[in-house]
Amino acid sequence: MNAADEENRSMAVERRSLYEEESTDLPLLRIESRSEDGAESRWIVGYAAKFGVNSLDLGDFVERIDPQAFGIVAERRGRKKPLETRALWNHDPNFPLARYPGTLRMNVDEIGLRYEFPVPDTTYGRDLAANIEAGIVRGSSF
């Protein structure tokens, strides 16, 4: 492999992380165990976006999310028919994790756009939870 091949190869790698890991003191994604009505459940809890933090270099620019960017989340609660939002594994509609309204809960707080949903009882849901717990999957996007 020559230098040109190396350069092309590195340019073909898709970046799936928005933030430098060192720049975040709060985990962007974790598993929580909860007890509701006597039943134990595991929840995936995370931030799809954090306010006031520069993204990784996305080419010739970086993104910085404004705290007003997700005002629509609050607006959805007041509608007769809420706008549907889906949590998907790797943005793939073949791997749904949760849906709003339904099992997906979202809110905007002082940190960013927070979400949570119960770990789905599917092979990919359990695999995702195991990868989060192992630190292999560390974040998400929106």
PLM regions: where:
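Signature of dsDNA virion morphogenesis modules
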Residues: 1-141
